[in-house]
Regions:
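Glycosyltransferase catalytic domains, chiefly GT-A lineage
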Residues: 1-149
Length: 149
């Protein structure tokens, strides 16, 4: 998957979620990050739980900036926005995911689709507890082999 998705110039692989960033990001986050534009609002939000980064000066700079924004209480907290009204359809603030998504849009970082789920399992023991009922994915086969080894 990585070989087919990344090229030599990519510094990261970030994974696309299903929800609009504007529905999952409070307005203060957009405003304080200078990202209060429709491109940021209308793009799908990334999932921050699984990321791949190439170690290089550019990726280190972006991750350091991500941390800086995540340490800004006005950007990261779940309190209602004070700098502007929440966008139509706003559901709730996804904190670090919101910040990461804004940075990825701004910097044009590489984003992969949902097919990565065929290769990862976050809670691998969970489906074992349901009688080895996996989903037939490659990761399910691999984890079953590990369990039975």
């Amino acid at each position: 998957y990585l070989e087919s998705t990344l090229n030599d110039n990519d510094i990261s692989l970030l994974l696309l979620g299903n929800a609009k960033n504007g529905h999952m990001t409070k307005r203060d986050c957009f405003i304080k990050m200078n990202c209060d534009e429709s491109d940021y609002h209308e793009s799908n939000q990334l999932e921050a739980g699984f990321q791949i980064w190439r170690v290089c000066d550019e990726s280190i700079k972006i991750v350091e900036e991500w941390l800086k924004y995540c340490l800004d209480f006005d950007i990261i907290n779940n309190a209602p926005s004070t700098l502007g009204d929440e966008l139509s359809g706003f559901v709730g603030h996804y904190n670090d995911q919101s910040v990461l998504t804004n940075l990825a849009i701004r910097d044009g970082l590489t984003v992969g689709g949902q097919d990565y789920r065929n290769f990862i399992e976050c809670d691998y023991d969970y489906w074992y507890e349901r009688g080895n009922a996996g989903y037939g994915r490659e990761i399910d086969k691999f984890l079953t082999q590990l369990k039975n080894a």
